[in-house]
Protein backbone atom coordinates (compact mmCIF):
# COMPACT_ATOMS: atom_id res chain seq x y z
CA UNK A 1 0.00 0.00 0.00
CA UNK A 2 1.36 3.42 -1.01
CA UNK A 3 0.41 6.33 1.26
CA UNK A 4 1.62 9.92 0.84
CA UNK A 5 0.61 13.19 2.48
CA UNK A 6 -0.92 15.71 0.07
CA UNK A 7 -2.07 18.49 2.42
CA UNK A 8 -2.47 18.95 6.17
CA UNK A 9 -5.76 20.76 6.86
CA UNK A 10 -6.68 23.31 9.47
CA UNK A 11 -9.38 22.09 11.82
CA UNK A 12 -11.87 24.96 11.33
CA UNK A 13 -14.75 22.89 9.96
CA UNK A 14 -15.00 20.59 12.97
CA UNK A 15 -14.98 23.26 15.67
CA UNK A 16 -11.21 22.90 15.68
CA UNK A 17 -11.20 19.54 17.42
CA UNK A 18 -10.43 16.98 14.71
CA UNK A 19 -7.04 16.68 13.10
CA UNK A 20 -7.41 16.18 9.33
CA UNK A 21 -5.20 15.68 6.30
CA UNK A 22 -5.54 14.74 2.64
CA UNK A 23 -3.53 11.69 1.60
CA UNK A 24 -3.10 9.71 -1.57
CA UNK A 25 -3.76 6.07 -0.74
CA UNK A 26 -2.86 3.78 -3.63
CA UNK A 27 -3.40 6.71 -6.00
CA UNK A 28 -6.81 7.75 -4.61
CA UNK A 29 -7.19 11.12 -2.87
CA UNK A 30 -8.65 10.56 0.62
CA UNK A 31 -9.57 12.66 3.63
CA UNK A 32 -8.19 11.18 6.86
CA UNK A 33 -9.52 12.33 10.25
CA UNK A 34 -8.47 11.68 13.82
CA UNK A 35 -10.46 12.01 17.02
CA UNK A 36 -11.07 14.59 19.72
CA UNK A 37 -10.21 14.99 23.37
CA UNK A 38 -11.97 17.54 25.57
CA UNK A 39 -10.35 19.70 28.29
CA UNK A 40 -11.28 17.06 30.89
CA UNK A 41 -9.47 14.34 28.95
CA UNK A 42 -12.60 12.64 27.63
CA UNK A 43 -11.70 10.86 24.39
CA UNK A 44 -13.97 11.14 21.33
CA UNK A 45 -14.64 8.13 19.14
CA UNK A 46 -15.45 10.06 15.95
CA UNK A 47 -13.71 7.63 13.55
CA UNK A 48 -15.94 4.78 14.74
CA UNK A 49 -19.06 6.99 14.73
CA UNK A 50 -18.44 8.07 11.14
CA UNK A 51 -18.02 4.49 9.96
CA UNK A 52 -21.15 3.36 11.82
CA UNK A 53 -23.19 6.27 10.40
CA UNK A 54 -21.88 5.47 6.93
CA UNK A 55 -22.86 1.80 7.27
CA UNK A 56 -26.33 2.68 8.57
CA UNK A 57 -26.88 5.12 5.67
CA UNK A 58 -25.80 2.40 3.24
CA UNK A 59 -28.27 -0.10 4.73
CA UNK A 60 -31.05 2.49 4.49
CA UNK A 61 -30.10 3.26 0.86
CA UNK A 62 -29.35 6.93 1.63
CA UNK A 63 -26.90 8.95 -0.40
CA UNK A 64 -23.85 9.17 1.82
CA UNK A 65 -20.10 9.34 2.06
CA UNK A 66 -18.57 5.95 2.62
CA UNK A 67 -16.14 5.97 5.54
CA UNK A 68 -13.80 3.18 6.56
CA UNK A 69 -11.21 2.69 9.29
CA UNK A 70 -7.47 2.44 8.82
CA UNK A 71 -4.62 1.97 11.25
CA UNK A 72 -3.56 5.37 12.57
CA UNK A 73 0.14 4.44 12.43
CA UNK A 74 0.07 5.00 8.64
CA UNK A 75 -0.93 8.66 9.09
CA UNK A 76 1.59 10.42 11.37
CA UNK A 77 0.30 13.89 10.41
CA UNK A 78 -3.18 13.16 11.82
CA UNK A 79 -3.39 13.53 15.58
CA UNK A 80 -5.19 10.79 17.50
CA UNK A 81 -5.86 10.43 21.20
CA UNK A 82 -5.68 6.90 22.66
CA UNK A 83 -7.25 5.24 19.59
CA UNK A 84 -5.65 2.95 17.04
CA UNK A 85 -7.74 4.03 14.05
CA UNK A 86 -8.56 7.02 11.87
CA UNK A 87 -11.58 7.47 9.61
CA UNK A 88 -11.01 7.69 5.87
CA UNK A 89 -13.22 8.68 2.94
CA UNK A 90 -12.38 9.16 -0.72
CA UNK A 91 -12.51 12.62 -2.30
CA UNK A 92 -16.18 13.52 -2.52
CA UNK A 93 -16.55 16.83 -4.38
CA UNK A 94 -17.48 16.55 -8.08
CA UNK A 95 -15.36 18.63 -10.46
CA UNK A 96 -18.33 20.78 -11.49
CA UNK A 97 -19.10 21.80 -7.88
CA UNK A 98 -17.61 24.66 -5.89
CA UNK A 99 -16.89 24.39 -2.17
CA UNK A 100 -18.32 27.29 -0.17
CA UNK A 101 -17.38 27.65 3.47
CA UNK A 102 -20.15 27.71 6.05
CA UNK A 103 -19.09 31.26 6.96
CA UNK A 104 -19.50 32.50 3.37
CA UNK A 105 -22.74 30.54 2.88
CA UNK A 106 -24.41 32.18 5.90
CA UNK A 107 -23.32 35.68 4.86
CA UNK A 108 -24.52 35.10 1.29
CA UNK A 109 -27.92 33.84 2.50
CA UNK A 110 -28.48 36.59 5.08
CA UNK A 111 -26.62 39.45 3.35
CA UNK A 112 -24.95 40.29 6.69
CA UNK A 113 -22.68 38.66 9.26
CA UNK A 114 -24.76 37.26 12.15
CA UNK A 115 -23.77 37.46 15.81
CA UNK A 116 -24.75 33.80 16.38
CA UNK A 117 -24.02 31.42 13.49
CA UNK A 118 -25.94 28.50 14.96
CA UNK A 119 -29.13 30.56 15.30
CA UNK A 120 -28.62 31.90 11.77
CA UNK A 121 -28.20 28.37 10.42
CA UNK A 122 -31.44 27.24 12.09
CA UNK A 123 -33.30 30.10 10.37
CA UNK A 124 -31.87 29.18 6.97
CA UNK A 125 -32.61 25.46 7.17
CA UNK A 126 -35.93 24.40 5.68
CA UNK A 127 -38.54 23.23 8.18
CA UNK A 128 -38.11 19.51 8.78
CA UNK A 129 -41.00 17.13 9.34
CA UNK A 130 -40.51 14.72 12.21
CA UNK A 131 -39.50 11.23 11.03
CA UNK A 132 -41.62 9.54 13.68
CA UNK A 133 -45.05 10.84 14.58
Where are these regions (language model features)?
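Conserved kinase catalytic-core segment
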Residues: 116-133
Amino acid sequence: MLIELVKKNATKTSRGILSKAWYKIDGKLCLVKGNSVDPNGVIGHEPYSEVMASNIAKLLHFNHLEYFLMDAKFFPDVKIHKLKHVSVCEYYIPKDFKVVSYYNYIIAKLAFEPADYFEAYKKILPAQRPILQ
